[in-house]
Curated annotation (Swiss-Prot):
Plays an important role in cell wall degradation and cell separation. Belongs to the glycosyl hydrolase 73 family. Transmembrane segments: none annotated. One of its GO terms (molecular function) is amidase activity. It catalyses: an N(4)-(oligosaccharide-(1->3)-[oligosaccharide-(1->6)]-beta-D-Man-(1->4)-beta-D-GlcNAc-(1->4)-alpha-D-GlcNAc)-L-asparaginyl-[protein] + H2O = an oligosaccharide-(1->3)-[oligosaccharide-(1->6)]-beta-D-Man-(1->4)-D-GlcNAc + N(4)-(N-acetyl-beta-D-glucosaminyl)-L-asparaginyl-[protein]. Keywords: Cell wall biogenesis/degradation, Hydrolase, Repeat, Secreted, Signal. GO terms for cellular component: extracellular region. The gene is lytB. This is Putative endo-beta-N-acetylglucosaminidase. It comes from the Bacteria. The keyword Cell inner membrane does not apply.
Length: 658
């Protein structure tokens, strides 16, 4: 009985749908339909062979029109006139629906390049996930899926392939889309397939053959966008090295296992070549190929001297080296001792090094006999009859009677023996540039006044000159009536002479007083003195700015910079914008000299340094080795005199206002 009932219900459903309904040759009376047997159709489908369409006759015997009909899980749509919609789109309440060839509304399905959702409505401007294809699609405003194009959706860019599939975790030209399909914006990306990092720029494309600055470091992206790592890059006429993490090597050492050598990379990442580097409390030299000099000799054309670099590249200084079956000595500045005497405090003996730096032995040099070990056999360097001595080391200190340092003087300077004070085997009482003190005998070499040059002063009738070397003189004052033209005068302080006292107009001038010259007048100095190619030219305004800000005389600043930098034309001036010799130590002037960013900063920065280290400490005038700036600023005992001479020369050219 149950089986018969089930078959009956199924038959009723079948007959209630278009598939189960049968064609009829009945007639229409308005919206009603009379079947062939004359009965009135109701609650059933009718196929009219004349109109070739299905109609649905409702319970009130009228056909359904402009409305939906649900039968089971299916929906049908009856159009105006009662025709059943099939294989077509129907618009209802602003939405579109698709009825298939059987008239059923499609749901969760593709219709061409359109998609209808769970309600049957066509999807518009929304995402669609199709589990059959395991892919995402996007339906645009026109109801069609995106295809072979980029779309920006809610601020993110997506790419859709042929067929509308969303591209994920792949490259598309120079762009990359992540696992969610969004185009990767600015930042790093690691691609496992290529086992490399890439950098995506702000425009969404990967960086290619270019530098990127990120989080305080530079990186280089090669052709194809691959990040350079553990490799060299040639760019901007220099080599650069990208470390294992891709960061550019900068201000650091790098060991290259391929060449088995160390290299140094400066600020900006440039490989150092033909250059010195101060690091680890030592000097190192990087050769023309960038490799560190190690266990070898290097000739530096700038200083015109040989240097030796030990294992690890450390510069040898104050040390002996055995090489080429001879001993060599590297001085405190690292230069090879050559054609000179060297006192070794360890063995407490003098040695002589010939041309090429070879140590002399078993021979006589300048009348002094050297033994088989190279030591001088002649005993003392002093001479009881000598009145003058010359400084032997690069610099040597002058001490008071208690052994406290008073000042220091440069190699080659000539000191007077002060016979009014006691000297002994270890120290000599001397006088130089106004300073009286004591110097170690080992730092001095006796001079023969009848043969050796002794500094002197002389007047030509117009100017009074200080001859500090045989071919070098400094005009220090105007001729005085008490002076005898052509006569050589000698003075231990440069002020007191036989028959007169010299008044140097600028040597003891208070440098905290402003000059009477304007910036424009200071600029004229270069043309008046015929000085060309100077970095200091037209910098009068900067000198005056320094004067106003730091209260230091601008004329002095110009003269000081002129002396130290050869009027802004020296190598240190050109390479480092250092015009005042700041930290240009006697042993390593170029290497140790401070670097300034530009000319103006070189002038202003040095003025600030001078104020803090000299003016503010009471040394407000140039002076000599007894007082003033010259005591500590320079080892040259006549440094102050030389600057004062330049000031005098400029003052005369500009009209004598100071």
């Amino acid at each position: 009985m149950k089986k018969v009932r089930f078959i009956f219900l199924a038959l009723l459903f079948f007959l209630a749908s278009p598939e189960g309904a049968m064609a009829s040759d009945g007639t229409w009376q308005g919206k009603q339909y009379l079947k062939e047997d004359g009965s009135q159709a109701a609650n059933e489908w009718v196929f009219d062979t004349h109109y070739q369409s299905w109609f649905y006759i409702k319970a009130d015997a009228n056909y359904a029109e402009n409305e939906w009909l649900k039968q089971g899980d299916d929906y049908f749509y009856l159009k105006s006139g009662g025709y059943m919609a099939k294989s077509e789109w129907v618009e209802d309440k602003g939405a579109f629906y698709y009825l298939d060839q059987d008239g059923k509304m499609k749901r969760n399905a593709w219709v061409g390049t359109s998609y209808v959702g769970a309600t049957g409505a066509k999807v518009i401007e929304d995402w669609v996930y199709d589990s059959q294809y395991d892919a995402w699609f996007y339906i645009k405003a026109d109801g069609q899926h995106a295809e072979k194009e980029w779309l920006q959706i809610k601020g993110k860019d997506y790419y859709f392939k042929s067929g509308g599939y969303l591209l994920t975790s792949q490259w598309i030209n120079q762009a990359y889309v992540n696992a969610s399909g969004a185009k990767v914006q600015q930042g790093w990306l690691f691609d496992k397939q290529y086992q490399s990092w890439f950098y995506i720029k702000e425009n969404g494309n990967y960086a290619d053959k270019e530098w990127i600055f990120e989080n305080g470091h530079y990186y280089y992206l090669k052709s194809g966008g691959y990040m350079a790592a553990n490799e060299w890059i040639w760019d901007k006429e220099s080599w650069f090295y990208l470390k294992f993490d891709g960061k550019m090597a900068e201000k650091e050492w790098v060991y290259d296992s391929h060449s088995q050598a160390w290299y140094y990379f400066k600020s900006g990442g440039y490989m150092t070549a033909n250059e010195w580097i101060w690091d680890k409390e030592s000097w190192f030299y990087l050769k023309s190929d960038g490799k560190i000099a190690e266990k070898e000799w290097v000739y530096d054309s700038h200083s015109q001297a040989w240097y030796y670099f030990k294992s690890g590249g450390y510069m040898t200084a104050n040390e002996w080296i055995w090489d080429k079956e001879s001993w060599f000595y590297l001085k405190s500045d690292g230069k090879i001792a050559e054609k000179e005497w060297v006192y070794d405090s360890h063995s407490q003996a003098w040695y002589y090094f010939k041309s090429g730096g070879y140590m002399a032995k078993n021979e006589t040099v300048d009348g002094y006999q050297l033994g088989s070990d190279g030591k001088w056999l002649g005993g003392k360097t002093t001479n009881e009859n000598a009145a003058y001595y010359q400084v032997v080391p690069v610099t040597a200190n002058v001490y008071d009677s208690d052994g406290e340092k008073l000042s220091y003087i440069s190699q080659g300077s000539v000191v007077w023996l002060d016979k009014d004070r006691k000297s002994d085997d270890k120290r000599l009482a001397i006088t130089i540039s106004g300073l009286s003190g004591y110097m170690k005998t080992e730092d001095l070499q006796a001079l023969d006044a009848s043969k050796d040059f002794i500094p002197y002063y002389e007047s030509d009738g117009h100017r009074f000159y200080h001859y500090v070397a045989q071919n070098a003189s400094i005009p220090v004052a105007s001729h005085l009536s008490d002076m005898e033209v052509g006569k050589k005068y000698y003075s231990a302080d440069g002020l007191h002479f036989d028959g007169f006292k010299l008044e140097n107009p600028f040597l003891f001038k208070d440098l905290t007083e402003a000059t009477n010259y304007s910036a424009e007048e200071l600029d004229k100095v270069f043309s008046l003195l015929n000085i060309n190619n100077s970095l200091l030219e037209n910098k009068g305004a900067t000198f005056k700015e320094a004067e106003e800000h730091y209260h230091i005389n601008a004329l002095y600043l110009l003269a000081h910079s002129a002396l130290e930098s050869n009027w802004g034309r020296s190598k240190i001036a050109k390479d480092k914008n250092n015009f005042f010799g700041i930290t240009a130590y006697d042993t390593t002037p170029y290497l140790s000299a401070k670097t300034f960013d530009d000319v103006d900063k070189g002038i202003l920065g040095a003025t600030k340094w001078i104020k803090e280290n000299y003016i503010d400490r009471g040394r407000t005038f140039l002076g000599n080795k007894a007082s003033g700036m010259n005591v500590e600023y320079a080892s040259d005992p006549y440094w102050g005199e030389k600057i004062a001479s330049v000031m005098m020369k400029i003052n005369e050219k500009l009209g004598g206002k100071d």
